[in-house]
Amino acid sequence: MALIGANGAGKTTTMRAISGGIHPTKGRVVLDGKEVQGLDASAIARLGLAHSPEGRKVFGPLSVEDNLLLGAYSRLPRFLGYRAKASADLDRVYDLFPKLRERSGQAAGTLSGGEQQMLAIGRALMARPKVMLLDEPSMGLAPVIVQEVFRTISRLKAEGITLLLVEQFAKSALEVADYAYVMERGRIAVEGTPAELSRNERVIAAYLG
């Protein structure tokens, strides 16, 4: 599912409200049949939701691998053997992003923008989420890296992970989504399948022209 709209439309705020970063004043957030709008972010993460935020938000001084391990923190007991219990998840992320394996001991803050985006997505995957929020995964990246990121998004979708994608490149977002919403001034203005939105004159003029 994709959420598109101009800067300031409320997309990132919506993502934060879903993931527990802020608490909505109205409405409900339902995850797997359970209302979660009053829970904090860590409790929502334990229920199976992971958030790859706008701007990546990696922990610069920590190594790539330590950043990834933090993603598993919500679901694994904190005792001796924690790293070993997460080894299969690390291998999965490294298979998706071989560059991260090469740089596993490197400080995350020294990575390129594209590598940091891979790390942010990988960190979210370490939680084994049922639902994954991706906020502007292509922001600031070179076109060739954007293509790689969207190939990964398509692969995650094929694996059965439910994805909510906020993306500045509306055309790319519609190519991977099954359904999409257009947000304007904090409200849903248009919604439909990618095929329907691609024929909508209002959407074409504002986002696809």
Set out the residue ranges of the language-model regions:
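Glycine-rich phosphate-binding loops of nucleotide-dependent enzymes
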Residues: 1-209
